[in-house]
């Protein structure tokens, strides 16, 4: 009997004095939770010897979140609306009246669904020329990485790209006439997909007009572009044609200057006694209609030496009478006759 009593006395101090193991688990499991969803932190102990006080902490520095006391192997702390800023490290501790024992750190990741992406064109903007290398850039302003992007022309997939660390992604292609129309992109990160708004690409000289079924086609912009290019050429041709006709009319026009007068010979008498010179007549070309014009010339008489001597002998008064007789009839100044008035 005594040996059994001694064995019992020695065995009692060898029993554990309290809890020895504390662990933290999450729901949903794995430490991943969607933004806006609920996160449950479950703290567990290996044994219960009475009331146990549970503590929940955030971060390595141990910002205390909650405290509960209950005689159970587990206790739960709930965060009802998780935000992206709630992503951090968490741990718990348990105390059964002795020294508290802490669990290991558990990392919590908050998954953020992608927001609606924005599609933009590169340096060319929404104006481009056939043959250009066009860059499509798609970016979701919010969303947990990695983000997967797909690029569309109308409903046809042009290509795809990914952003392992978040942010946006680009896709390049060489522009052809078949690429006229609407473009869009789609972003997803495993938590749902979002589609961007449709953006129309305008080729230089071509307008893109959406139709009822959403497919764009070439409009009258092509006609406007052609007219814009041909108008200066047409004006230049009209001007050259007008100038050519004007030069042709001038070359075919009747002579506007007075015709060269060919005097029909002088019949003036060489006698000193002849006072009155005989007029000369000349017909002028027909200028207008059936009218014929005549010019009458009076040429001063060239005096013979004897006549000149006669003038010097009889003085100035007689010379004046001779001059008066010679120029008694009006003379026609050919140089001032305007043939244009006759037309």
Swiss-Prot record:
CDD domains: Ig. The lineage of its organism: Eukaryota, Metazoa, Chordata, Craniata, Vertebrata. This is Fc receptor-like protein 1. Residues 241-343 are cytoplasmic. Disulfide bonds join 138-185. Residues 17-219 are extracellular. Residues 17-109, 117-200 form the Ig-like C2-type domain. It holds the Pfam family Ig_3. The chain crosses the membrane at residues 220-240. Interacts with ABL1. Interacts with GRB2 and SOS1. Interacts with SHIP-1/INPP5D. Glycans are attached at residues 51, 202. Residues 251-278 are annotated as: Disordered. PROSITE patterns: IG_LIKE. A motif (ITIM motif 4) lies at residues 325-330. Widely expressed. Expressed in B-cells at the various stages of differentiation. A motif (ITIM motif 1) lies at residues 266-271. Changing residue 281 to F: Impaired BCR-mediated signaling and FCRL1-induced B-cell proliferation. Impaired phosphorylation. Its main location: membrane. Residues 258-269 have a biased composition (Polar residues). A motif (ITIM motif 2) lies at residues 279-284.
């Amino acid at each position: 009997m005594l040996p059994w009593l001694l064995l019992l006395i020695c065995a009692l101090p060898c029993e554990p004095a309290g809890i020895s193991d504390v662990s933290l688990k999450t729901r949903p499991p794995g430490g991943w939770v969607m933004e806006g969803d609920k996160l449950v932190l479950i703290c567990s102990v290996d044994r219960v010897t009475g009331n146990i006080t549970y503590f929940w902490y955030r971060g390595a520095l141990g910002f205390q979140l909650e405290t509960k006391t209950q005689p159970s192997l587990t206790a739960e702390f709930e965060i009802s609306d998780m935000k992206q800023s709630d992503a951090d490290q968490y741990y718990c501790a348990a105390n059964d009246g002795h020294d508290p024992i802490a669990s290991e750190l558990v990392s919590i990741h908050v998954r953020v669904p992608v927001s609606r992406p924005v599609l933009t064109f590169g340096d060319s903007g929404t104006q481009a020329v056939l043959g250009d290398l066009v860059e499509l850039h798609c970016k979701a302003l919010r969303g947990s990485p990695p983000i997967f992007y797909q690029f569309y022309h109308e409903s046809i997939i042009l290509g795809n790209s990914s952003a392992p660390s978040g942010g946006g992604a680009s896709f390049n292609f060489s522009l052809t006439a078949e690429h006229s129309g609407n473009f869009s992109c789609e972003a997803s990160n495993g938590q749902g997909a979002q589609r961007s708004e449709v953006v129309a690409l305008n080729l230089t000289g071509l307008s893109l007009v959406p139709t009822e079924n959403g497919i764009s086609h070439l409009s009258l912009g092509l006609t406007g572009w052609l007219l814009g290019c041909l108008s200066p050429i047409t004006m230049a041709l009209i001007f050259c044609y007008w100038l050519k006709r004007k030069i042709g009319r001038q070359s075919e026009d009747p002579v506007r200057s007075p015709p060269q007068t060919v005097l029909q010979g002088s019949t003036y008498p060489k006698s000193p006694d002849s006072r009155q010179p005989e007029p000369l007549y000349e017909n002028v070309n027909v200028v207008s209609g059936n009218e014929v014009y005549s010019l009458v010339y009076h040429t001063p008489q060239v005096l013979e030496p004897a006549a000149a001597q006669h003038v010097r002998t009889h003085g100035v008064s007689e010379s004046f009478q001779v001059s008066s007789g010679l120029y008694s009839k009006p003379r026609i100044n050919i140089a001032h006759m305007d043939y244009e008035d006759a037309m």
